[in-house]
Curated annotation (Swiss-Prot):
Annotated region described as 11 X 4 AA repeats of C-C-X-P, given as residue ranges: 35-231
Tagged with keyword Repeat: yes
Name by which UniProt lists this protein: Keratin-associated protein 5-3
Organism in which the protein naturally occurs: Homo sapiens
Tissue specificity comment: Restricted to hair root, not detected in any other tissues.
UniProt function note: In the hair cortex, hair keratin intermediate filaments are embedded in an interfilamentous matrix, consisting of hair keratin-associated protein (KRTAP), which are essential for the formation of a rigid and resistant hair shaft through their extensive disulfide bond cross-linking with abundant cysteine residues of hair keratins. The matrix proteins include the high-sulfur and high-glycine-tyrosine keratins.
Residue windows of the Sequence repeats: 35-38, 41-44, 47-50, 91-94, 150-153, 160-163, 170-173, 189-192, 199-202, 218-221, 228-231
GO cellular component assignments: cytosol; intermediate filament
Amino acid sequence: MGCSGCSGGCGSSCGGCGSSCGGCGSGYGGCGSGCCVPVCCCKPVCCCVPACSCSSCGSCGGSKGVCGSCGGCKGGCGSCGGSKGGCGSSCCVPVCCSSSCGSCGGSKGVCGFRGGSKGGCGSCGCSQCSCYKPCCCSSGCGSSCCQSSCCKPSCSQSSCCKPCCSQSSCCKPCCCSSGCGSSCCQSSCCKPCCSQSSCCKPCCCSSGCGSSCCQSSCCKPCSSQSSCCVPICCQCKI
């Protein structure tokens, strides 16, 4: 069809020219400033998906104003702040973990399958649709927690999203249950030195150890006990 006011002629596959598409409803975009590009006008516009722009045809894996293979073109972002969401029902990517959004705090969108990056859920996948953080411990703190930063102070709830617990049993990979020996998987998983004689650091030494201690970083300020936590750093001389 003809495209008046544009450079060149438009073929039969042209959706329209420039801003003179007409008939575009809410949530639909036009051709922008370009003319005579294939199937350009009156298509759903995807908002606020990263790594896309509509500055030129094909930059989003398709024509301007069309959701391409990269997730779509940036359109009117609305309240999403240039990241995700804000498109309403015409978005090309899921923006919420639940169909009604609600607890996700984002814009309504298509729920799709669980897991993947949807509206802030992260890449490790949610254990339930209402989850907004990367993962949650279902119960307790140990191996059921995907990563150390996904737990609340008290990990009894099914929805937990904060760092290590304040209790002796914390959400990091491991903790010493009692003593310091092999019950502690690694030094990085323990709380700072306990106030008790048995602490969670790799080792502690009693007074008089001095230079005979393997590593100064493994010792507590001198304590009254003669035994120190693993690994044994020194033969204490009293």
